[in-house]
A protein has these predicted regions:
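Well-ordered, non-membrane alpha-helical segments in soluble/globular domains
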Residues: 29-43, 159-180
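Bacterial Sec-dependent signal peptides at the C-terminal "C-region" and cleavage site
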Residues: 11-28
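Leucine-rich tandem repeat or coiled-coil scaffolds
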Residues: 29, 38, 81, 85, ...
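Bacterial N-terminal signal peptides that target proteins for export
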Residues: 1-10
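Low-complexity, serine/threonine/proline-enriched polar segments
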Residues: 86-162
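Glycine-rich, aromatic-bearing surface loops/beta-hairpins
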Residues: 169, 175-242
Length: 242
């Protein structure tokens, strides 16, 4: 896709999201409406970013037990980050150093948290947090933020899918990310193909698989290989794109 077509699509998607926000009935929201809201916010953030020497974008999605919002806890925050090649070998974590290039390049603990853009955060009032909970309630997500205690297999590998509500959100974000890649929006923004990493602090198997699905042309292969090398996911857990 040409840069001009990519940017035109970028603008059209942004307008769809803004229209959805304006027309949405308060307290009730469908998956399609919430997806449009997420997409609109993601495009707004991308539009704000300067093109530098970025090598990857990260969609950081992490359930936070510390915050309570509208009576719920352990619901996911969503922030957008990027990292530049010029930052490699410059430790951005004041508490500990990376054990190697893989960790410094891909572990979110070594990405600059001075450069975070919120998509969903839980500081009241927050329209995106309200929309997330309205969507959960409208679609009947049960025990929002709760999680089963039976989440390890016989080899003590974590096989859970995160707290209730996270799989549903991750599915939408994966769909949006895949569309950004296949429609050429990321390439049009940065002038080159970049991986979009879906991540949490724990490098969970389901986040790694979501990243593989969201980057259908192998954009995130270097990240996937790093996760395999470090045992964050095994080959039998990894779901490859066909």
């Amino acid at each position: 896709m040409s840069e001009r077509k990519g940017m035109a699509l970028f603008a059209a998607l942004l307008m769809i999201g803004l229209t959805t926000c304006a027309n949405m009935a308060k307290g009730e929201i469908s998956a399609a409406e919430f997806k449009d809201m997420l997409q609109s916010r993601i495009l707004e953030v991308l539009d704000e970013w300067r093109v530098e020497d970025q090598y990857a974008v990260m969609f950081f999605i992490y359930p936070n037990e510390e915050y309570e919002y509208r009576g719920y806890s352990n619901i996911p925050e969503f922030k957008m980050l990027y990292k530049n090649e010029s930052e490699m070998e410059h430790n951005v974590n004041p508490f500990f150093r990376a054990s190697g290039d893989d960790e410094e390049r891909w572990n979110p603990a070594f990405w600059s948290y001075d450069r975070q853009w919120p998509v969903i955060e839980f500081e009241e009032p927050n329209p995106m947090a309200d929309a997330l909970i309205d969507w959960y309630e409208s679609t009947g997500v049960q025990d929002i933020g709760g999680e089963s205690s039976d989440v390890f297999d016989e080899n003590m590998r974590y096989i859970g899918t995160g707290p209730n509500g996270l799989p549903e959100l991750l599915k939408l974000v994966t769909e949006i990310t895949k569309e950004l890649q296949t429609d050429g929006v990321i390439e049009a923004k940065f002038g080159r193909k970049l991986p979009v990493i879906l991540a949490d602090f724990d490098c969970t198997w389901y986040m790694i698989n979501a990243t593989a699905e969201a980057n259908p042309n192998g954009e995130a292969e270097a990240y996937i290989q790093a996760c395999l090398r470090h045992g964050d996911i095994s080959e039998d857990q990894l779901v490859r794109n066909n």
